[in-house]
């Protein structure tokens, strides 16, 4: 398969690009230049790997979920344990890389957006480590849902700005973070949390997250002597999925499955299934599939999981859908909750609600596969942050 994206203008087919105001263009170009240089610099790579190994705790285990496998019948189920990273999710793979890049560029301050709070915590964490000032924008609704993560960020020295505009969720937090970046661009780096935004952000985030798929490939071959037949990951903006999928894109014998949030059902207005129900548009500096109405107004995305309710999806996922290399599906709130409880009871692992969407789809997929086949789930994060809201949800039901 001939796959080499993005092109030199930052496009993935028709998607991606740089739809930014003139005031930001210079910074985006400067970032691209700095990033290219850093990736070719052995000292930078060495420093990054040092922190990934000794601070983040990589490599993360590839765990054979024997009880889940027995329960499902069919394929052997493996879990890539990104929940065991420092701060409890895949987010830190990207924040540590971008923070080192910020230091390299001479920036003193970092701004970021966060939905579930995981990216905010991971950003505040690396800023504490590297002595950078940190400002985090978070939607009002998410601040309510994720009180503990807000407190964590503040403990780590970050300033958390609550965003009341719009729906008070991730999309609005990104708007404010971009606005802040425009006016503080001389001394501030924006750490985008997913494979979104203007080029080079989708590429930078993908490359820093690719450690997930690269490790998985190596570990699976050591365990089974071949590549897995299927790989499953959840998708909000799509960074854990892109990090898992990208190293497998050329291995066409490996089926790739991305799982979005169907919320209350894709037949309702309350979902975040952008690739299933969306259409092409521009948001936050990039062309991608979006949830929008006929007038092109962005629609509210809904998911029980704060990390999946973004109304867009990364440009590279948009392309991978169009060319058919990745198969995209959606899972409802209820199905995700069921999978959350099942994995907890069967394996003693409490997954994040985001990751539970991937687990739920894998539960449908595994029984359709043969016993000598393997299925890897990217367990993108741990569920400590969700226990309170799940308790509330179950009491209401």
UniProtKB/Swiss-Prot annotation:
Entry annotated with the keyword ATP-binding: no
Cofactor(s) required for function per UniProt: pyridoxal 5'-phosphate
Coiled coil: none
Annotated EC: 4.2.1.20
Presence of the UniProt keyword Amino-acid biosynthesis in the record: yes
Gene Ontology cellular component list: cytoplasm
Catalytically driven reaction(s): (1S,2R)-1-C-(indol-3-yl)glycerol 3-phosphate + L-serine = D-glyceraldehyde 3-phosphate + L-tryptophan + H2O
Biological or metabolic pathway of the protein: Amino-acid biosynthesis; L-tryptophan biosynthesis; L-tryptophan from chorismate: step 5/5
GO MF annotation, one: tryptophan synthase activity
Signal peptide: none
CDD domains per record: Trp-synth_B
Pfam family, one: PALP
Modification sites for N6-(pyridoxal phosphate)lysine: 91
EC class of the enzyme, as a word: lyase
Annotated keywords: Amino-acid biosynthesis, Aromatic amino acid biosynthesis, Lyase, Pyridoxal phosphate, Tryptophan biosynthesis
InterPro entries: Trp_synth_b_CS, Trp_synth_beta, Trp_synth_beta/beta-like, TrpB-like_PALP, TrpB-like_PALP_sf
Record-stated family: Belongs to the TrpB family.
Task of the protein: The beta subunit is responsible for the synthesis of L-tryptophan from indole and L-serine.
Subunit relationships: Tetramer of two alpha and two beta chains.
Protein name, entry field: Tryptophan synthase beta chain
Organism per entry: Bacillus thuringiensis (strain Al Hakam)
């Amino acid at each position: 398969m001939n796959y080499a994206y993005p092109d030199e203008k930052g496009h993935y087919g028709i998607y991606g690009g740089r739809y930014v105001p003139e005031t930001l263009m210079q910074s985006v170009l400067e970032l691209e230049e700095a990033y290219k240089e850093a990736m070719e610099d052995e000292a930078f790579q060495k420093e990054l790997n040092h922190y990934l190994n000794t601070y983040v705790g990589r490599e993360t285990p590839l765990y054979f979920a024997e009880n889940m496998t027995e329960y499902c019948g069919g394929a052997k189920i493996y879990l890539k344990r990104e929940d065991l990273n420092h701060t409890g999710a895949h987010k830190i793979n990207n924040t540590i890389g971008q923070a080192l890049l910020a230091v390299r560029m001479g920036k003193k301050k970092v701004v970021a957006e966060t939905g579930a709070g995981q990216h905010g915590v991971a950003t505040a964490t690396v800023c504490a480590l590297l002595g950078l000032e940190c400002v985090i924008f978070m939607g009002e609704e998410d601040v309510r849902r994720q009180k503990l993560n807000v407190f964590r960020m503040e403990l780590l020295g970050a300033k958390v700005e609550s965003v009341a505009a719009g729906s008070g969720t991730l999309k609005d937090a990104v708007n404010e973070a971009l606005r802040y970046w425009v006016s503080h661009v001389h001394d501030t780096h924006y750490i985008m949390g997913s494979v979104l935004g203007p080029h080079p952000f989708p590429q930078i985030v993908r490359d820093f997250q690719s450690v997930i798929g690269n490790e998985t490939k190596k570990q699976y071959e050591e365990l089974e002597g071949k590549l897995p037949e299927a790989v499953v990951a959840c998708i909000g903006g799509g960074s854990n999925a892109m990090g898992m999928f990208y190293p497998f894109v050329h291995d066409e014998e490996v089926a790739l499955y991305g799982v979005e949030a169907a919320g209350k059902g894709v037949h309702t207005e309350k979902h975040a299934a952008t690739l299933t129900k969306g259409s092409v548009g521009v948001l936050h500096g990039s062309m991608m599939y979006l949830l929008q109405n006929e007038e092109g107004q962005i629609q509210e995305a809904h998911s029980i999981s704060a990390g999946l309710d973004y109304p867009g999806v990364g440009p590279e996922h948009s392309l991978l859908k169009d060319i058919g290399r990745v198969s995209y599906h959606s899972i409802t709130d209820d199905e995700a909750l069921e999978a959350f409880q099942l994995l907890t009871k069967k394996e003693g692992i409490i997954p994040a609600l985001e990751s539970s969407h991937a687990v739920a789809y894998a539960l449908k997929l595994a029984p359709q596969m043969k016993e000598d086949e393997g299925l890897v789930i990217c367990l993108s994060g741990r569920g400590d942050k969700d226990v309170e809201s799940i308790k509330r949800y179950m009491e209401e039901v």
